[in-house]
């Protein structure tokens, strides 16, 4: 039995999140069915992922692992599994890893990118793939509010009531807000994220950007540790799992899908 890691990308618009659900069609369902077909239909295949994305959330870089007796070249895994996947899900790479590697528990950090379209009307060509705000936004105020969130904190004010995490303390290493033409690009990196944490952070930052709340409110909200005081959970459309960081001992290059994700913004929109 050997352990294989695979890197995935997917458009989450058509799927009810990553994780298998009793009455839903999920990315995990599709991937495990494709793996079973590639393996010859010898039984179910179980996978573990780096980050469980919600309904409508995308991935430019999702990492999974599975244990298997099947021996194939790396490129055979990529081409073979992709042959059984729908167009909105793709295996980008595959490689053997040691039994010490765990897609979820070995990860040092995850990075999410949120694409927000600023315009009078919603972006038809980005439907399902970008969030939308039609009100003017005070970006400097949003950046000031974002700085109050950096570091290790209890993020209870930004976790959903369905969150199953054992504790709400997370370390937010990065929260950048970049202007790219009509888009705002939010980049968030943390050791791990709570359920709906990114979308709740975006929702709160938009409250500040729209002038409904002050920069000081963000700090007070963080300290309150009460989700009921926070902003509504923002739409999933523009959210992408974009990078996973693992210790050097596992021999991965930087697993960052951000270059592919942000390539449309290079040049004319940069």
From Swiss-Prot:
Q: Has the keyword tRNA processing been applied to this entry?
A: yes
Tell me what reaction this enzyme catalyses.
uridine(38/39/40) in tRNA = pseudouridine(38/39/40) in tRNA
Source domain of life: Bacteria
Name the cystine pairs.
none
Q: Which residues bind substrate?
A: 112
Does the keyword field hold Isomerase? Answer: yes
Alphabetized, the UniProt keywords read: Isomerase, tRNA processing
Q: Name one GO biological process term.
A: tRNA pseudouridine synthesis
Give the protein's recorded name: tRNA pseudouridine synthase A
